[in-house]
Structure formats: structure tokens, C-alpha cells
């Protein structure tokens, strides 16, 4: 049985980052809404509780409080931002509006040598004070400490930026240790979880396989399972894990909608049929998908058509497998949280995710989601431990509608064929080019990145087909062909992103190869837009 950390979500947009930092310390945790019942908290039996931030104010919403059971359990509690403020209010302190709201970078002084912050610092002042570079985002502030608490940290604008009652194991910080902008944030969360809470660091993917396999076998018994295999990381790892558990009781359905990457179908079939000896039904439905997309230019309409047709094709194949009683999906933990699918109804729906609803009820199947407790990085670790090749497990994200949202405007087979080849060349150049000391000296990458491929140094890279033509010259003749844009970004969370500063030589080779090898494209441009204001995908 794993030790567990309970994260109570008060509505912060970065609560998932708290969970990721805890998991990175190899400790299991779950996110639940702040208004879970006292019985739920007691039954969860956490080693510690973390209270998240919130957009709310302690003045405006007196319902946003931690359950009383949190304070009755006798376990350590860490409050972050709003979590600090509700801790103060609930335990007898005072919170008030701040005349100097803090949003962004701040330098914070640590006080009192508490267990949480002792010896954790970014620099020391001339007076010998330990300082931390942190990220603030608050309009209220704690004005009066609760009984039993001592000052732990301060900034010029926030005299009480941290507080601690070490006898009870209660700590609170006004900054956000979960975000990368707080330089020592990961170290702070790790210290709370491992040293203060004493949680065992035994949440390791290699060991998780045995537990997951046993759970799948217990759920499924001798019944059969059907899974939609897309070639993406999540469905591939889910398929490999379920196949490890129940073998031929699993049938994978791979639908080719005509909008896959170059040779993607062959790679998936070689992997699952060839290496894993799994049962795979391959459906070429490209004519059906492309036929329904003809004349459609609106991005959202294209997404809906592709989603609708996938469901139709998958349903038709599923009905042929009359013995199947389970539908398996590659749902991962962020999907569950973002869809309001945590174990209570409080979670706010940020987006409706395709993996969390729909098909099981339509088909009358039970739902099997073996990855629903894992973050993406954990899914990748699990895939490697299951023996999937790194080039499959560490592939860049690929949208569900495939090339359909990387072809601007109407989708045609001709456009998809051109884009597939251009995209493959760009990815090949990224994989085949390693960062050099000269790249590091020019500020394109860090010194630690020298020797890594530029594919691994970018978070997502792809080509986009633009349905416009431009004049060119090839040989002695005039050309009038299509334009493609290359896009590469670097990000830690995909919520914001910077365009990747790739070496000019790499971009030049990719451009030359695309223009020379892909007949029909005579101009290549590079997208240098960040997110925001642009999104990563063009549609």
C-alpha cells in the first residue's frame, strides 16, 4: 500500500503542477475538490494534505474552506497561496486586502530556520539573510498569524509570506512552489512530502506494472476488451499494459482516417502485431473521412466531423466483436481532472475530453482506464518499462484529428500527402541534428543540452500546410506551388510556449529538402509566434 498525499483543489489553474511535483518525488497523490466530506478525508488516510491556490478571495467566498477533518487528522498540512490564507482564517488568524498586490517574480527572505526552508536559498544578502526567488500571484495577504504560528518568510510587499506551526506540522507559503519560476520550488515540495510528512518514495513506474496488471486481471476476469489504438503515446501504453495483463483477450482497433503521419500505420502494426503479437484490426477509412471533410473549412467543424466519423467507424467494428464486454481507453490523470471527472462533483470542467464520455454507454460496454491515475511523464516511463521503443514513447504530441487541423482550410488527400512528406523531413532533420557547443555559445540551448538531438530539445514540432501558392524558380522554369510552415516550440506544461530557436543550418537543410523532395511545395517559412498570443497548433 502506497503512502498518499491529499491535494485539495480550491480552483487554481496550476493545481496539477502540485501533483506533478509530488509524483516527481515518487510519492502517490490525488487531487480532490476542497469541499469533500470529512468522512472522505478520514477514509483517504493521507500522510499529509496540501491546500492549493485559488482565484477566489477569503472575503468573497466563505464556502472555500478545507474540511474540518484536515485539522483533526494530526498530519502535516501545506497551504499554498489561497491555501495559506484559508489556513490562517480557519485556525484563528486574519486575512485582509493587500495594498500592494504581487503578481510575478519576487525575492523572499526566509525567517526562523524552519524545517521546510532551512538551508534552501537562492542567494544570500550582504547582511547574511537567505533569499529565495519565488513566483507570487495574490491580492490578499495574511495580516495576523493564527495562534501557535511563527513567521517563516517575508517580502517587502508581503510581511507574512510564509508561516509555520512546527509543533503541528502546519506550513504555509504565499508564493507558488509548484511553478518552475520558483527556482527551489521542487526542493521545497519534496522536503515537505519526504522529510516532514515522512512519505515513502515508492511510487515508481517499473514497480507499478505488477500492481496495474493485477488490477486489470481482477477487473476483467475472463471477459474480452476492445481498445481504439491511435498510435499516440497514451493508447499505445494502455494497449501494451492491458496486453501484458490479459493477452489475447484484448483486441485493438486501428482506424486510418487518412490524416496520419508518414508510415504511422505501418509502425503501429509492426509494433503491436509484430513485436507484441497483439490482435489488431486495421481499418482503412480514409475515403469515408476525406469524403465528409470535402468543402469544410471551419476548424471546429472539421474536428467535429473527424470525431463523429471515428465514433461511427469504431462502433461498426466493435459490434463485430460480440464477445467484448469492456472498452479500454488511454485516459490519463489530467483528462480526468480537466473533465471534472474526479471522485466528487465539485471540480470545474475546463474542457470536455473525448476519452471521458460517450462511447462506453453507446456500446453498452464497461470502461477500462488503466492509466487514469498517471501523468504524461509517468505514462512515458511506464511505456519504456513495458518494452515499447523510446521513439514511440517519447514522440511529440499529435492532435486527435491528425493532419486535419494542420491543413488550413479544406482538407484534401493531395494536401495530406504533401504535408505528410514535408513533416517527415522536418522531424528527420530534428532527430538527426545534435546541439553543439557553438549552439550553446549562441544561446540556442544550455551547455547541458550539447549532444542531444534537437527533436529531444523541442517539446513539439511539425509542419503546417498553407492552402496558398507562391511563385518560385526551379532550374530555368517558373513554379507556382504551395507553401508550408514549420513550427517548433519549447514548453514545460503546454499552457504557455516559446518558439524554438533552432540553428539556421538545420532550418536551411529542412527547407532545401522539402522544396527539392516534395513536388508541389516551393516555399518554406518558420513560425516564430509564442503561446500566447498564438496557440501551438494552427487550428
UniProtKB/Swiss-Prot annotation:
PROSITE patterns, per database record: GATASE_TYPE_1 (PS51273), GMPS_ATP_PPASE (PS51553)
EC number(s) recorded for this UniProt protein: 6.3.5.2
SUPFAM superfamilies in the record: Adenine nucleotide alpha hydrolases-like, Class I glutamine amidotransferase-like, GMP synthetase C-terminal dimerisation domain
Annotated pathway: Purine metabolism; GMP biosynthesis; GMP from XMP (L-Gln route): step 1/1
Keywords recorded for this protein, A-Z: ATP-binding, Glutamine amidotransferase, GMP biosynthesis, Ligase, Nucleotide-binding, Purine biosynthesis
Boundaries of every GMPS ATP-PPase domain copy: 203-395
Catalytic activity, as annotated: XMP + L-glutamine + ATP + H2O = GMP + L-glutamate + AMP + diphosphate + 2 H(+)
Annotated Gene Ontology cellular component terms: cytosol
Protein name: GMP synthase [glutamine-hydrolyzing]
Organism: Burkholderia cenocepacia (strain ATCC BAA-245 / DSM 16553 / LMG 16656 / NCTC 13227 / J2315 / CF5610) (Burkholderia cepacia (strain J2315))
Originating gene: guaA
